[in-house]
Amino acid sequence: MKAGKSERERSGRRRHRSGDALTTVVVKQERLSPEPVAHRRPDAPAASLSPPAAEPGHSGHRGSRARSPAKKKSKSSGRRSKSPRTKRSQSPHYPMVKVKQEREDHPRRGREDRQHREPSEQEHRRARNSERDRHRGHSRQGRSSDERPVSGQDRDRDSQNLQAQEEERDFHNARRREHRQQNESAGSEAQEVIPRPAGNRSKEVPVKEKPSFELSGALLEDTNTFRGVVIKYSEPPEARIPKKRWRLYPFKNDEVLPVMYIHRQSAYLLGRHRRIADIPIDHPSCSKQHAVFQYRLVEYTRADGTVGRRVKPYIIDLGSGNGTFLNNKRIEPQRYYELKEKDVLKFGFSSREYVLLHESSDTSELDRKEDEDDEEEEMVSDS
């Protein structure tokens, strides 16, 4: 019994599988148009696969033919056979319709998607093409503008620009030339001429002034300190100690004061600041650093025309408030004035006078004044 049941189940499964295969085949056959088969076999029996008769009132090439009601499929259950055709007719229409709808919907969806996508893609393509056309148009315009023949106004403009540039160039070249000439003239003035022997007097070789790497300006002022006080003045490179013994003879009204020997240094600072002053001046009208007595090595011309060198005394005012007077004339500040024998110096409003003499000077007048002073003192003491 069990074996018979299993065989029946197997046979039923096989039939079901064969029926499913046939139905799938039938679905594929139904996709093909059945119309050409009907045209080929118009006298086919009632059991053929022709479609049902058209309803009255509908027009068509099939509607003209009358079909017998015997050809219609009977709905009675007694006439149904177990053939594969009946099984095919018994298969539900829903899966067939679903299959057809799915197959028909896919291309529709694809078309709709393409229709939705195409406008956006077309817009992007149009935008890209328009941008390319613009760039090409700009490049063509630039090329055409470069290739265009230059008009008269443009030529005039270019010529004016060239002229302006040439004028500026000439102006700058002239300025450079002037500066160069000035520098050359200044250098030639600073050069020293060294005479050659008598045979080669016509050719004189100028010697350039060597650069000085010594301190100057503010750096020199910072380093030029004495006893913790910054000195306003710095000695020049031609400063020398004199061989001649110069002296200063001070007088206060008619009173003769002690002689000052000023030949041991190259410079003497005169002022009210006793800490740094070499020759102190105690009058309140004088400045702390009032003036400087300086010896300098300078050139002079001899009687035979040759050039010699000599150390001479000079006085320079350091910008004092009340000034320095040479022979009762005020001198300019920050400027050297040469001193000669028997010159008289005064500083500020002080009543003291300083007479400049040296060891070989005629001091008879001074000796006479000293003798008179001594006689007056003796007379006063006797009385």
UniProtKB/Swiss-Prot annotation:
PROSITE patterns documented for this protein: FHA_DOMAIN
Cited Pfam families: FHA
Coiled coil: 153-194
Extent of Low complexity compositional bias: 44-56
Cross-link Glycyl lysine isopeptide (Lys-Gly) (interchain with G-Cter in SUMO) mapped to chain: K28
Listed InterPro entries: Cell_Proc_Reg/RNA_Proc, FHA_dom, SMAD_FHA_dom_sf
Keywords recorded for this protein, A-Z: Coiled coil, Isopeptide bond, mRNA processing, mRNA splicing, Nucleus, Phosphoprotein, RNA-mediated gene silencing, Spliceosome, Ubl conjugation
Extent of Basic residues compositional bias: 59-90
Modified-residue entries (Phosphoserine), positions: S18, S33, S48, S50, S91, S145, S381
Domain of life: Eukaryota
Location (main, coarse): nucleus
Positions of crosslink type Glycyl lysine isopeptide (Lys-Gly) (interchain with G-Cter in SUMO2): K28, K100, K210
SUPFAM superfamilies according to UniProt: SMAD/FHA domain
Linked residues for Glycyl lysine isopeptide (Lys-Gly) (interchain with G-Cter in SUMO1): K28
Compartments it resides in: Nucleus
Biased composition annotated in UniProt, kind: Acidic residues: 370-383
GO biological process terms on file: miRNA processing; mRNA splicing, via spliceosome; negative regulation of canonical NF-kappaB signal transduction
Segments of this protein annotated with the region Disordered: 1-209, 359-383
Record-level Gene Ontology MF annotations: transcription regulator inhibitor activity
Domain FHA residues, every copy: 268-331
Post-translational modifications: Degraded by the proteasome upon binding to the SMAD1/OAZ1/PSMB4 complex.
One Gene Ontology CC term in the entry: cytosol
Subunit details: Component of activated spliceosome complexes. Binds SMAD4 and CREBBP/EP300. Component of the minor spliceosome, which splices U12-type introns. Binds the SMAD1/OAZ1/PSMB4 complex. Interacts with DROSHA and SMARCA4. Component of the SNARP complex which consists at least of SNIP1, SNW1, THRAP3, BCLAF1 and PNN.
Protein name per the record: Smad nuclear-interacting protein 1
Organism: Mus musculus (Mouse)
